[in-house]
Amino acid sequence: MTKEFHHVTVLLHETVDMLDIKPDGIYVDATLGGSGHSAYLLSKLGEEGHLYCFDQDQKAIDNAQVTLKSYIDKGQVTFIKDNFRHLKARLTALGVDEIDGILYDLGVSSPQLDERERGFSYKQDAPLDMRMDRQSLLTAYEVVNTYPFNDLVKIFFKYGEDKFSKQIARKIEQARAIKPIETTTELAELIKAAKPAKELKKKGHPAKQIFQAIRIEVNDELGAADESIQDAMELLALDGRISVITFHSLEDRLTKQLFKEASTVDVPKGLPLIPEDMKPKFELVSRKPILPSHSELTANKRAHSAKLRVAKKIRK
């Protein structure tokens, strides 16, 4: 891992080991990031195995081309610079119509958070950006300065689950009427000013939920995850597995619901046997989400909210 792209991988062994890797299998890392999961997965593949890695951040791919060089030289890795919502189309174009396993590490990566100019962090002053793909058009600046009041309230409440969404949106509306809100610090201060004093005494930064909400809107994170996970589940071969790491309740709720729908069936009352074509296509590998160990939590504070869910395809 290069110094410019330092990222501590969360739930490394659990996420990959739960995929039950076949040495000659075809696998996908839908969120390459710092390439930690990819490197560990590749170490389990034989010469016939292959890994397809997706990331919309060119810096992540540039970093992986260094850290995964030995596997690249053996022709075991293919990098795809794209949003993982296009996963099915991109894989199909490469002649891949079935995979043995796939993993997702959802949310923003540590290097993106730590790189000041990306504008993801409320702790560092930077232009309002928050794009995971630097070539996409919508930025946090546009959301904050051009979205109508009601849209801001909806986004803050839906994606940030902040009970002061209206007050914050009103404060933003008043400020931008005087001049555009241009930096993360300006926005964070407005959010703080919109909240009552007793709220500011609570643990955690007062701007955290709103920054999350804007980031999700800018990158359409939940829409992309929904599309991609459903497509991935279709692509899985029989006995193929999918591992999904989430970092907040919205991502976890989405993943849990998709897995539940695929692993359960509504059987009409009184039906003695479930017809084959009505049986669920998936089963949960673990009923409850897998959480980081105590030692991992001690070593990496960013792992504290991580949850891993895994499902296995049992019927085509």
Swiss-Prot record:
Protein name in UniProt: Ribosomal RNA small subunit methyltransferase H
GO molecular function per UniProt: rRNA (cytosine-N4-)-methyltransferase activity
Major subcellular location class: cytoplasm
UniProt source species: Streptococcus pyogenes serotype M1
Binding site for S-adenosyl-L-methionine: 35-37, 55, 84, 105, 112
Family of the protein in this entry: Belongs to the methyltransferase superfamily. RsmH family.
Top-level taxon of origin: Bacteria
Keywords carried by this UniProt record: Cytoplasm, Methyltransferase, rRNA processing, S-adenosyl-L-methionine, Transferase
A UniProt-annotated Pfam family: Methyltransf_5
Enzyme class, UniProt record, top EC level: transferase
HAMAP family according to UniProt: 16SrRNA_methyltr_H
PANTHER family: 12S RRNA N4-METHYLCYTIDINE METHYLTRANSFERASE, S-ADENOSYL-METHYLTRANSFERASE MRAW
GO CC, alphabetical: cytoplasm
